[in-house]
């Protein structure tokens, strides 16, 4: 979907157009936050939170940013009040991500 690609590649102008002019669904906006955090696109993340008013309600967004080593996104999410995963939740997230990519624990 175009909105996910825009968020993942940091194409903020396209993302703005899709949200403001094409009126994409709320669920797609949530997925765009996940995509922006996964790929470390802080400008897109800020737009989604500050202008598109996507509420930061999912701890998985912090987990995506942390797992993919985007500390600027982690810090931003936490500063804005996004819930942080517990150690147990994060361990489960890591296990799930590794299983998707075929990695084993300890690799």
Model-predicted segments: where are they?
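Ankyrin-repeat boundary/"N-cap" motif
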Residues: 1-5, 26-35, 55-66, 87-93
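Conserved ankyrin/ankyrin-like repeat signature
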Residues: 13-14, 43-44, 72-73
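Ankyrin repeat domain, specifically the short helix-to-loop turn at the C-terminus of the second helix
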Residues: 16-25, 46-55, 76-83
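Ankyrin-repeat-protein effector appendages
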Residues: 71-107
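Small side chains
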Residues: 3, 16, 44-46, 65
